[in-house]
Amino acid sequence: MVNNTSNQPTSYPIFTVRWLAVHTLAVPTVFFVGAIAAMQFIQR
């Protein structure tokens, strides 16, 4: 997948502060949305 001879990332630094901020918000959000959606179908 890496076609360059150098190991420098050309224009895609993946692990950035933006990536960290997006994932610290997105991972619990997806978890809680799935948990709340599952709670809607629990019958007592």
Swiss-Prot record:
Query: Which SUPFAM superfamilies has this protein been placed in?
Result: Cytochrome b559 subunits
Mind listing the UniProt keywords for this protein, alphabetically?
A: Electron transport, Heme, Iron, Membrane, Metal-binding, Photosynthesis, Photosystem II, Thylakoid, Transmembrane, Transmembrane helix, Transport
What parts of the sequence cross the membrane? 19-35
Q: Where does heme bind?
A: H23
Assembly information from the UniProt record: Heterodimer of an alpha subunit and a beta subunit. PSII is composed of 1 copy each of membrane proteins PsbA, PsbB, PsbC, PsbD, PsbE, PsbF, PsbH, PsbI, PsbJ, PsbK, PsbL, PsbM, PsbT, PsbX, PsbY, PsbZ, Psb30/Ycf12, peripheral proteins PsbO, CyanoQ (PsbQ), PsbU, PsbV and a large number of cofactors. It forms dimeric complexes.
**Record NCBIfam families:** cyt_b559_beta
Q: What does this protein do?
A: This b-type cytochrome is tightly associated with the reaction center of photosystem II (PSII). PSII is a light-driven water:plastoquinone oxidoreductase that uses light energy to abstract electrons from H(2)O, generating O(2) and a proton gradient subsequently used for ATP formation. It consists of a core antenna complex that captures photons, and an electron transfer chain that converts photonic excitation into a charge separation.
User: What is the designated name of this protein?
Assistant: Cytochrome b559 subunit beta
Organism source for this protein? Crocosphaera subtropica (strain ATCC 51142 / BH68) (Cyanothece sp. (strain ATCC 51142))
At the highest ranks, the source species' classification is: Bacteria, Bacillati, Cyanobacteriota, Cyanophyceae, Oscillatoriophycideae
What gene name is listed for this protein? Answer: psbF
